[in-house]
Amino acid sequence: MAKGAREKIKLVSTANTGHFYTTDKNKRNMPGKMEIKKYDPVVRQHVLYKEAKIK
């Protein structure tokens, strides 16, 4: 059975609130670290989220 191309990642808020989202990404199409603006409910505004490994 072949290994899948998708891996689970955690998107951590850069506002240092401790809030995070979990998602998955295709590591063949996106080899770099993912950065995306998403809503942080702790500070109630859109902030930058950066990729981190799920432990």
From Swiss-Prot:
Residues in coiled coil: none
Annotated family: Belongs to the bacterial ribosomal protein bL33 family.
Source organism: Aliivibrio fischeri (strain ATCC 700601 / ES114) (Vibrio fischeri)
PROSITE patterns per record: RIBOSOMAL_L33 (PS00582)
Domain of life assignment: Bacteria
CC per GO annotation: cytosolic large ribosomal subunit
Protein name: Large ribosomal subunit protein bL33
Keywords assigned by UniProt, alphabetized: Ribonucleoprotein, Ribosomal protein
GO molecular function, one term: structural constituent of ribosome
